[in-house]
Structures are given as structure tokens and as C-alpha cells.
């Protein structure tokens, strides 16, 4: 047994090496702003460190940052305090980002053990999780998903221990950890409902109060502060930057959440599948349905274990969290499901064990047809394992290196544009760009994103999207912006591709090319006459 545990531990340690290697390669954060949110977190951290309040320094008017809670920015602000020079301080930020991956792995091992896995199995499952390219990518990004997943895991472990020992002190600690998770990412709010339900069903209502008190305090404090400081605006761009709820309610039609759920559900299942077996290439014959089948497989395992054991706090939270991302106005891609990935991984391994036990039983049967079926299922399982392993190899040898090589080239082009801006533009000139955080950090110019169309994606209102971009000079004038920075990723945006012809658009009379680089173009926009 010790030999198996040692082998599993070695596998887990080796599974962390690709993430460490990528963190070293990407330590200068050429990909800063890849998710947009990461740039906003980094700028909010700068604001905290400089003592200017919790603000969006890059946005014209510098409104308060009332969209993202301050958990991660507070942590990153320590980097700005110790090393305030940008971009020289970015490698220090990578230390914080990279530390989240082993922390997530350790907490996930403890979680799976607490749910019934052996330590050996838990380490193997978590090693597979941290090898996933989506997890590795977030392990080298200034995003809160791994941090909130770690805090949630600690919260769940403490809550389970509080019930086992009937301890109010541990229940309080669990609530504090839940509050920290909420202050890192507000999507942790389902804990506020899941916790009391679970404690009550376990006949520990007294502990529920100790759990809820610090969690509720975190929700009340952040909600009160953000409500009082939200910029009073009906402008869609400002609302996007400053309010999740405001952005959701803006132009929301009656019962439109039903459309969100209908279109988000297949993405939800695919994202679960991709976090377990990455989709570097479509499976022959099955194609896009393979990740969904993997997602359903994991959910089946969760349900099976629930029926055999009982409904835990992790199930109540995952149910509430899943409902939240399904009704949201953005497709629930892999990023959104990282906080509940350990549960899906647990469900997948439970179902694999169940299937393997069934195959072994059938193989020992005297009936030839049962042995034939067992052989078929064994072959399918072996093929899936081989396919999954090959996808990891492709991800680490081809996909991830390609992504970061591309962003190295993009930043090189952008920095030449930034040098031109610093030499030729007045300091306060706002710039329209999807690289708003990066543009502000390298030039000091206020910057803002181009129009955002979450609801049009669900409505398939491509005409409105095309018209809005055709009228971009009007949009720019309304924001007092005269300049536009376009990058390579803008042209390849999967939502806009086929709708917006950037080459045709920027060849119009309102656009004057000022700087052209291999992967970036900088324009002056004249308002229409």
C-alpha cells in the first residue's frame, strides 16, 4: 500500500511540473489581458497599492471597481507595494498565480479523500486534473478560479469536520473561508443557501448559524459598498465594467433566462467533459458530442454516489452554482466550472470504478456473450484512456506552446504601437481596444473595450452586431475616443468572425491608419459628418 501511495504521490508531483515550466516561460505575462478580467484584477491591485481606492484606473473617469470583489486584487496589491515598477513586477505576480495550482491540487486530494476515495486514488485523480491544459492555463493567469476553488475546498472540509466534531468553532472557521471565497468571486454565493440546508438536514442547525454569520457579513459588506459606489450610469460600457447584475438586467427580455439555459446546457456538459478529457481534436465519428458524453458520465457517477451515500454540502453547492451559470448570459465555458471540478472528477472516477467492476464481473462469467460484452467495454475504456492521454500530449507539446508563442508575438507588435503612442499622443487621449488593461499599463492612456454583445449571441441578432460596428465612429465619439487599437485576436474572435469584416470596416473614410505592425494596427477615427 505504501508503495502505491508513493507512486501516486510521485505522479502528482510530476503532474505539476508542466504547470511550473509554463509559469517560468510565461513569467513576463505576455498574455496579460487574454481573459480581460485578468487585466482588470491587476489594475484594481495597482489602485489598492497606490492608495487611490478600489478603482478602475484604466477606464475614463476612474470609477470604483464595483464588479469584482477585492480578494484577488488585495493579494496582488502586495506585489505592487513591493515592486511598483511595471512590467518588471510581473514575474512576482507569477509567483502568486503559480502557487495556486499546487494549493488547488492539495485541497482537492483532501476533498476526494473526505468523500470516500483512497489517498492513492485521490492523488491520481488530482494529478490528472492538474495536467489538464485548461487548469494549467489558469495556473499561469491572474484569474480567481483556482483561488476560489481552493478556498471553497477548505470551506467544505471545515464544514464536514464541524459536523463530525459538533464544533461551533470549526463551523465559524468554515463560514469565514466561505466568506473569503465570496470576496474572491461572488459566484460562491450559493454557499449562503447550501450551507444552512445541509446543516439542517444533518440536524446541526446550531452550527448553521455559526457558518452563516461570517459568510452573510461578507455578502452584506461587499454588496453595500459596491451598491453605494457603483457609477450612476445607463451607459452599456460603464455598466459592463462596474456591475454584474446591471449588465445582466440591461435589455433583458421577459423569460429570456429560459433561452440562456437552453443554449448554455450543451456548453455546460461540454465544459465538464473538456476539464476531464481536453478537446484538442474532435473524436472521429462522435465529434462534438464526445465532451458532452464525458460530462454526462461524470454526472452519472455523482448521482450514483449520492444514492449510495447521502447528499453532501458539495452537492447542494454544486447544484446552486450550476443553476447560476446556466441562467447567466455568457456560455459556461471551462473557466466557470473550475470551482466545482473536484466534484465532477470524483463522479467520473466513481463511475469508472463502477464500470470496471461490472466489466470484471462479466469477464469472469461462464456465458460467452457476457464475456464478449465485457471485452467490448474493456476495449472502449482502453481506447478512451489512450485518446485522453494523447490529447494531453498534444496540449502540452503543441497547443500551450503555440498559444504563448502567439501572445509573445502579439505583445511585441503591441509594444511598438505603445511606443508610438507615448511619443505622439497627448496623455489623456482615450483609446478603444480589447487590450484596454494592457494599453493603460504600457501607455498611461485611459482605455475601454469595444461594444459587448452577450445577449445578441443568444438572440442571434447578427444584424444589430454588424450595424453597431459599422457605426463605430459614432460609438467612439460618444465616449470621446479618437483612437482604435486592433489586434490579431480581434480579427479571430469566434463571435465576430463572419459578422464584422475588419478590413472593409477600417478602409472607410472615418479611419486613418497611424501605425501598422504584423499583429496590430492603430487608427485615428474621425466622427461622421
Task: State what each model feature region is.
Residues 374-436, 469-478, 482, 526:
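Membrane-embedded, lumen/periplasm-facing catalytic core of multi-pass transferases
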Residues 92-100, 124-154, 159, 168, ...:
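Multi-pass, polyprenyl lipid-linked donor-dependent membrane glycosyltransferases
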Residues 8-13, 176, 192, 212-220, ...:
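Signature aromatic-anchored transmembrane alpha helix within multi-pass, membrane-resident enzymes
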Residues 70-74, 82-103, 138, 142, ...:
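Loop-to-helix entry region of an early transmembrane alpha helix in multi-pass inner-membrane enzymes
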Residues 114-116, 155-173, 181, 306-309:
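Membrane-interface transmembrane helices that cradle and orient dolichyl/undecaprenyl
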Residues 21, 25, 205-300, 383-395:
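Membrane-lumen/periplasm interface segments of specific transmembrane helices
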Residues 138-139, 145-148, 181-186, 190-193, ...:
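Hydrophobic/aromatic-rich transmembrane helices and adjacent perimembrane loops
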Residues 92-116, 154, 158, 296-303:
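Transmembrane-helix motifs of polytopic, lipid-linked glycan transferases
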Amino acid at each position: 500500500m505504501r508503495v502505491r501511495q508513493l507512486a501516486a504521490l510521485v505522479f502528482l508531483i510530476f503532474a505539476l511540473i508542466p504547470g511550473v515550466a509554463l509559469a517560468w516561460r510565461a513569467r513576463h505575462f505576455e498574455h496579460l489581458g487574454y481573459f480581460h478580467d485578468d487585466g482588470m484584477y491587476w489594475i484594481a491591485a495597482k489602485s489598492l497599492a497606490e492608495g487611490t481606492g478600489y478603482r478602475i484606473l484604466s477606464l475614463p473617469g476612474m470609477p470604483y471597481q464595483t464588479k469584482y470583489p477585492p480578494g484577488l486584487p488585495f493579494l496582488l496589491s502586495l506585489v505592487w507595494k513591493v515592486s511598483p515598477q511595471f512590467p518588471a513586477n510581473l514575474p512576482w505576480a507569477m509567483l502568486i498565480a503559480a502557487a495556486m495550482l499546487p494549493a488547488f491540487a492539495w485541497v482537492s486530494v483532501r476533498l476526494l479523500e473526505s468523500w470516500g476515495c483512497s489517498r492513492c486514488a485521490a492523488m491520481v485523480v488530482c494529478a490528472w486534473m492538474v495536467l489538464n491544459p485548461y487548469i494549467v492555463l489558469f495556473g499561469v493567469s491572474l484569474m480567481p478560479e483556482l483561488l476560489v476553488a481552493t478556498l471553497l475546498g477548505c470551506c467544505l472540509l471545515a464544514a464536514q469536520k464541524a459536523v463530525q466534531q459538533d464544533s461551533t468553532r470549526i463551523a465559524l472557521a468554515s463560514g469565514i473561508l466561505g466568506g473569503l471565497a465570496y470576496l474572491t468571486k461572488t459566484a460562491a454565493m450559493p454557499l449562503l443557501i447550501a450551507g444552512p440546508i445541509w446543516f439542517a438536514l444533518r440536524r446541526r442547525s446550531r452550527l448553521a448559524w455559526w457558518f452563516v454569520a461570517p459568510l452573510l457579513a461578507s455578502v452584506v459588506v461587499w454588496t453595500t459598498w459596491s451598491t453605494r459606489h457603483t457609477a450612476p450610469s445607463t451607459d452599456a460600457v460603464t455598466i459592463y465594467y462596474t456591475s454584474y447584475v446591471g449588465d445582466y438586467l440591461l435589455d433583458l427580455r421577459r423569460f429570456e433566462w429560459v433561452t440562456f439555459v437552453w443554449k448554455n446546457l450543451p456548453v455546460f456538459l461540454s465544459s465538464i467533459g473538456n476539464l476531464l478529457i481536453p478537446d484538442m481534436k474532435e473524436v472521429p465519428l462522435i465529434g462534438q458530442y464526445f465532451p458532452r458524453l464525458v460530462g454526462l458520465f461524470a454526472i452519472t457517477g455523482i448521482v450514483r454516489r449520492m444514492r449510495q451515500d447521502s447528499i453532501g454540502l458539495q452537492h447542494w453547492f454544486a447544484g446552486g452554482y450550476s443553476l447560476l451559470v446556466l441562467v447567466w448570459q455568457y456560455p459556461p465555458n471551462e473557466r466557470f466550472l473550475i470551482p466545482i471540478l473536484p466534484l465532477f472528477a470524483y463522479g467520473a472516477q466513481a463511475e469508472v470504478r463502477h464500470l470496471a467492476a461490472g466489466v470484471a464481473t462479466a469477464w469472469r462469467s461462464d456465458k460467452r456473450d457476457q464475456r464478449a460484452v465485457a471485452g467490448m467495454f474493456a476495449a472502449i475504456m482502453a481506447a478512451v484512456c489512450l485518446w485522453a492521454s494523447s490529447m494531453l500530449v498534444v496540449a502540452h507539446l503543441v497547443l500551450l506552446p503555440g498559444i504563448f508563442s502567439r501572445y509573445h508575438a502579439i505583445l511585441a507588435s503591441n509594444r511598438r504601437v505603445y511606443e508610438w503612442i507615448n511619443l505622439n499622443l497627448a496623455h489623456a487621449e482615450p483609446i478603444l481596444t480589447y487590450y484596454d488593461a494592457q494599453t493603460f499599463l504600457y501607455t498611461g492612456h485611459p482605455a475601454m473595450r469595444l461594444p459587448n454583445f452577450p445577449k445578441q449571441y443568444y438572440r442571434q441578432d447578427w444584424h444589430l452586431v454588424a450595424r453597431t460596428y459599422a457605426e463605430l465612429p459614432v460609438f467612439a465619439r460618444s465616449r470621446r475616443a479618437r483612437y482604435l487599437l486592433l489586434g490579431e485576436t480581434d480579427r479571430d474572435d469566434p463571435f465576430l468572425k463572419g459578422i464584422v469584416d475588419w478590413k472593409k470596416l477600417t478602409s472607410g473614410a472615418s479611419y486613418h491608419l497611424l501605425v501598422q505592425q504584423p499583429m496590430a494596427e492603430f487608427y485615428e477615427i474621425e466622427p461622421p459628418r
